[in-house]
């Protein structure tokens, strides 16, 4: 399953790492997952497990093996990471393994374009520099 927000609300539900402390929310979300779900609305990469755990990529050496357990994977964001790392974030799925990857890009160029766009607030570009 691939969604932007969550399996329960595919377009716009936020699921943050700290939501693992809200067991009711996690249980309800996982009720919609058959096995694996990939999402990214919060732009914070990591793996959510059905037993209310969240693993940031660095906690799992940037790899996670898929098995019979239901998981929800936040792939992060190519253009607007929000985990404090300004590099682009994505995942590679190969066989039964997910690998989190980061690549450098020049957020300063994107920030300048956002600042030049009258309909956008400057903070949208400024936060790219810090990955927030």
For each feature predicted by the language model, list its residue ranges:
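Acidic, His/Gly-rich catalytic cores of divalent-metal-dependent hydrolytic chemistry
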Residues: 50-132
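Conserved catalytic scaffold of divalent metal-dependent phosphoesterases
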Residues: 1-38, 42-53
């Amino acid at each position: 399953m691939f969604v932007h927000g969550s399996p329960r609300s595919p377009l716009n539900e936020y699921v943050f790492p700290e939501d693992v402390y809200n067991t009711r929310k996690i249980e309800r979300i996982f009720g919609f997952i058959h096995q694996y779900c990939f999402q990214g609305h919060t732009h914070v990469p990591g793996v959510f497990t059905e037993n209310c755990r969240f693993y940031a990529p660095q906690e799992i050496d940037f790899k996670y093996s898929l098995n019979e357990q239901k998981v929800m994977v936040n792939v992060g964001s190519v253009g607007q990471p929000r985990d404090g790392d300004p590099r682009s974030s994505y995942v590679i799925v190969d066989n039964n393994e997910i690998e989190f990857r980061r690549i450098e890009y020049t957020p300063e160029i994107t920030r300048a374009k956002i600042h030049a766009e009258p309909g956008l607030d400057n903070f949208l570009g400024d936060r790219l520099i810090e990955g927030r």
